[in-house]
Amino acid sequence: MSSLPMFDSVSRFLPTANEDEQFWWKLTGRHMARMMHEAGYPEDRQVECLLFHRFKVVPCLGPRPHSDKPWYKSRVGGGAADGCPINYSWRFGTSDRKPHIRNFIEPLGALTNTPADPLNEVATKALLRDYSMTLPNVDLELFWTFAPHYRPRIIEKADMEKLAGASLLVGAEMSPDSRNIDIKAYMYPRVPSQTSQLLTTILPQAMRDAYGEDVCLDSLNLVRDFMTNDPEGSQLTLTGTTGIDCCKLQDTRVKIYVITRNTSFDHIAAIMTLGGRRPISEELLNQLRALWFELKGAPADFTSSEQLPAQTKPDGTKNPIVVPFYFDIQPRLALPDVKAYVDVSTSPVSDLAAAEAVVRHLERHGSGQNPKAYMNVLQDITPVEELETRKGALAFYSIAVKKNELDITSYFNPQVYKRYFAHEVQLNGQRRSAFE
């Protein structure tokens, strides 16, 4: 793999860091540098984003690993992850746009995993406030308005202990042709009753509080109607997860995440088109079907009305397939955008085969720019033999329709804990991490 001159130059003049920050910088800083290098980011943008990562992300990643078991299991990365508080995404983009990279973190602080901060909110809110003071494009008005609506109103200690866990995540998008770093926040209601009230009570009131009493809720109401009355939409289940943009109020989006357990492609297509309300060309639906079947290990002629077979785990039990989506709500738009997620961790195909399938699709249809650069990134983070034989590097592929082509993003994990002893050596009877 080629060298990373920007990472080496930045590292050369950094002040001495503590052991934890030094570990996270050497590992995740190199990952970020590799992604930007392969994506063709301008050199000055690479330096800018690396400095942001070093001073605004790395200090929030907590103690360095000292075993293959996380001291706090972060929610970042979904079911494929190993508890590491950071993962990455590579948006292939479209034929006229370079790849965009992002990272997602759950900030960890002094109060994380203690009774003083059972929902792990303190470090995240402090980080967001810091971003709002140092990044001129960041505006937290929507976040501060929404956050109280998602917080559980519980005073009983036993109840709070049951609900302890991640309630907030932060995403940072670093596009190649901008001076901005775009921040996103993700909220998770911990009380089940809050999730069931999301579309009927919580979101309508939160949006009125944020945008004003006369805010147009047509897009939100359409989602609620679709999930209530449409035979396909009524099979969706709210997860409670809500994503928002931390920018000027007039430009913000609200993302509502749902899942379905119906894995037939006809059902997937019905959700993507909102039951025909958002038409997608037959050509694009055919592309989506072919990619869906390939990523899920189904033959190309698999019947579109049939359910995909569940994967059998090593212990003989079945691994049910869940398909996530999100609806992108914007008050100024009557129709929400829809994005589907393909969970690679529940697929019988290897991580390498899944990645190669996506690259073939992009090359076949002339989409994206230099999709093989993505393979260089994956193989730099995880050895090829592990991509071929193990699961966990890839989390999801998301698929949306933009400008009459499929817009695909890959979400992948550094596997800091899972690979801790991957290349262990014996040194004076001690195990030694491959990252040391």
UniProtKB/Swiss-Prot annotation:
InterPro entries: Aro_prenylTrfase, Aro_prenylTrfase_DMATS, DMATS-type_fun. Keywords: Transferase. It comes from the Eukaryota. CDD domains: PT-DMATS_CymD. Its EC number is 2.5.1.-. One of its GO terms (biological process) is alkaloid metabolic process. It is an enzyme of class 2 (transferase). GO terms for molecular function: prenyltransferase activity. Pathway: Secondary metabolite biosynthesis. Pfam families: Trp_DMAT (PF11991). PANTHER family: INDOLE PRENYLTRANSFERASE TDIB-RELATED (PTHR40627), PRENYLTRANSFERASE ASQH1-RELATED (PTHR40627:SF4). Prenyltransferase; part of the gene cluster that mediates the biosynthesis of neosartoricin B, a prenylated anthracenone that probably exhibits T-cell antiproliferative activity, suggestive of a physiological role as an immunosuppressive agent. The non-reducing polyketide synthase nscA probably synthesizes and cyclizes the decaketide backbone. The hydrolase nscB then mediates the product release through hydrolysis followed by spontaneous decarboxylation. The prenyltransferase nscD catalyzes the addition of the dimethylallyl group to the aromatic C5. Belongs to the tryptophan dimethylallyltransferase family. This is Prenyltransferase nscD. It comes from Arthroderma otae (strain ATCC MYA-4605 / CBS 113480). The lineage of its organism: Eukaryota, Fungi, Dikarya, Ascomycota, Pezizomycotina.
